[in-house]
Amino acid sequence: MAVRSARARRLQTVLLLALIVIGTGLLLTRCPANRDGMPGQLAQAMTETTSAARSGASALDMWMAERSTAQLTSVQLSDARDEVINAYEGIAELRADDPADIARQQMLTESMTSIIGTLNAASAAVRGIASQPPADRVRNDLLAVAAELERGYR
């Protein structure tokens, strides 16, 4: 009986280790940066950028509908800008070898720069700086750039 229980414990240990290894492998393959290399990193940065642009547009929607304060909207716009900056930093120094990746990286960094500028203009509009375009135009610009980025990236 003792031999059988020792064998069962060993088998249990081996199965547990196998499950941990398989689980870790599955977790790593779900991450696009690990699964797809540079294309995955670029796709992730594109997703983060379009999400941030849409978050900024949503913050402006709430502010224009008077459902949010100028201070909260400014914080949300700053957070969206920071998300784009972090995504930019993640891909700006990547060294692409594939012409398609080089083109995507260039298009993505140009779009990110445009979105950062638009988010800055949105923040200025919320703060009431007269030389900035109206908030509804900035909101539409954010949504248009996000949609164009998604269309152009594919």
Question: How does the language model describe each region?
Answer:
Residues 10-28:
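Hydrophobic membrane-insertion alpha-helices, especially the h-region
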Residues 1-9:
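Short, Lys/Arg-rich N-terminal segment immediately upstream of the first membrane anchor
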